Amino acid sequence: ELKDIQKNCLRNNISIVLQEPFLFSKTIKENITITNKDTDFEEVRSVTRISHIDDSINKFKDGYDTPVGEKGTTLSGGQKQRVAIARALLKKTPILIFDDSLSAVDTETDFQIRKSLKEYEKEATTLIITHRISTAKDADLIIVLDDGKIIESGNHNELISKDGLYKKIYDIQTKMV
């Protein structure tokens, strides 16, 4: 059971990126390497490219040495999320959890990050919690929750054919585009 696993073991094997990530009053680089301080710069660049934040960082006057301020106040919501994704990837855990962690980025950036993560995901089990069908539809298994209960599961095509809640959300979101 999960309660029998030591917290240290969980922390060392799971990386979580929250919708509202916490950033420290340090530089961008220090925020990314906080759990892996001895990382060489090329590894840092690699994970920032996957999270599509590298170009934004390079536009800052001080680049990776840019201070982010208290709780990351100098960064936009999407930039904070992408820095947190880079930090999680750098930790190299076998389990990654993204809890609506792309909600503050536009759909094109969301698509580019998911595309970049495909290669990385071969080395880790990835759980993505999202309200965006475009983010969920390529998953091997989609679990639909309603009021905290599992009501449907399957891949995108299976869930569309079931004509349940997933299909209703899909119809609403595709009409909005």
PLM regions: where:
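Catalytic Walker B motif of ABC-type/P-loop ATPase nucleotide-binding domains
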Residues: L96-D100
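A short, proline-enriched helix->beta-strand linker immediately N-terminal to the Walker B motif
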Residues: L90-P94, E123
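ABC-fold ATPase nucleotide-binding domain signature/coupling loops
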Residues: L2, D54-V83, S101, V105-E108, ...
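ABC nucleotide-binding domain signature
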Residues: N8, I14-Q19, L127
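Hydrophobic anchor residue at the start of the ABC signature
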Residues: I85, I129
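C-terminal portion of ABC ATPase nucleotide-binding domains
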Residues: K59-G63, K115, E119, E123, ...
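Conserved D-loop/post-Walker B switch-helix segment of ABC ATPase nucleotide-binding domains
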Residues: D106-S116
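ABC ATPase nucleotide-binding domain helical subdomain, centered on the C-loop/LSGGQ "ABC signature"
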Residues: D4, R11, K29-E70, R114, ...
